[in-house]
A protein has these predicted regions:
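Glycine-rich loop-to-alpha-helix module at the N-terminal edge of alpha/beta enzyme cores
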Residues: 5-11, 16, 59-156
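Short, basic and Ser/Thr-rich N-terminal targeting/leader segments
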Residues: 34-37, 45-48, 130
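Short, P/G- and charge-enriched loop/turn segments at secondary-structure junctions
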Residues: 36-40, 184
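Active-site and channel-lining beta-strand-loop segments
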Residues: 41-64
Length: 210
C-alpha cells in the first residue's frame, strides 16, 4: 500500500463472506451493543494514512479517524520511525468496543487473538456462573456504571450498594457515589442512595478477626 497513491478499492460489497464469518463468530458470546458488523477490520492487512483493509480485501477510507484521537492516521512514517528507534510497540489504538477487529480471514485460524477471542476466553473462565455473553467497556468507570445498571435491573431499583473505605471507582456520576478516597470527589454531586461503606478486611487470620 503506497501512501501517495492508495485509494478506496471495493472488491466485494461489504459485508463479504469473510466479514460475515467473523461477525457470526463474534456474536456468539459478545453482548449486543454498538458493534458494527458490516465492516470487519483485518489488522493483519495494510493500513496507511486514513485507509485500512477489511477481511475481504476491500480498502476502506476511515472516517472515524481513531475516534478523533489520532488524526495523523495509520503508520505515520515519523511515528513509526520514533517507535522503532525507542524499540516500542507500534502505536495502535482502535475502538475495540465498536468495531470488530480481525487478524486474518478466518477466526478459527488466527495468528493473534482478537477481542472476539477474548469473549470466548471469558466464557471459559466464568463457565461456572452460566453467563451467556460478555460486554467490554472503554474504562473502569464505564465498567462500574454498567455493573451498577445490571444490579439495579436485577433488583428492580431496590437494595444497597457496598463499597470500601479508600475506594476509587471513577469520575463518572454514578461511580462517584462509590468513591471513598477523597471527599472532594463527591462534594456537590447528587448521590445514588443506599450506598454503604465498610473497612476493607486485610486480616490474614482464620477465622477473620476484623
Amino acid at each position: 500500500m503506497n501512501r501517495e497513491t492508495v485509494s478506496v478499492n471495493i472488491k466485494t460489497l461489504p459485508p463479504g463472506p469473510n466479514a460475515r464469518k467473523w461477525s457470526e463468530f463474534h456474536r456468539r458470546y459478545a453482548a449486543r451493543s454498538t458493534y458494527h458488523e458490516g465492516f470487519v477490520w483485518d489488522r493483519s492487512k495494510p493500513a496507511i494514512g486514513p485507509f485500512c483493509t477489511d477481511v475481504d480485501g476491500n480498502v476502506i477510507l476511515d472516517f472515524v479517524s481513531h475516534v478523533a484521537s489520532s488524526a495523523l492516521g495509520y503508520n505515520h512514517p515519523e511515528l513509526v520511525r520514533m517507535a522503532s528507534k525507542l524499540q516500542a510497540v507500534d502505536p495502535d489504538r482502535y475502538a475495540g468496543c465498536d468495531f470488530i477487529g480481525a487478524w486474518g480471514e478466518d477466526p478459527e485460524k488466527m495468528e493473534i487473538p482478537t477481542p472476539s477471542h477474548l469473549h470466548y476466553k471469558l466464557m471459559e473462565l466464568t463457565s461456572q456462573f452460566g453467563f451467556g455473553s460478555a460486554f467490554f467497556s472503554n474504562s473502569g468507570a464505564e465498567a462500574v456504571e454498567n455493573a451498577m445498571k445490571i444490579c439495579y435491573d436485577h433488583k428492580q431499583n431496590y437494595g444497597y450498594g457496598i463499597c470500601f473505605y479508600g475506594a476509587f471507582h471513577g469520575r463518572t456520576l454514578g461511580a462517584l457515589s462509590l468513591n471513598r478516597s477523597k471527599k472532594i470527589q463527591r462534594d456537590w454531586f447528587p448521590q445514588i442512595p443506599n450506598i454503604v461503606d465498610f473497612p476493607y478486611c486485610t486480616c490474614r487470620d482464620h477465622p477473620c478477626q476484623c
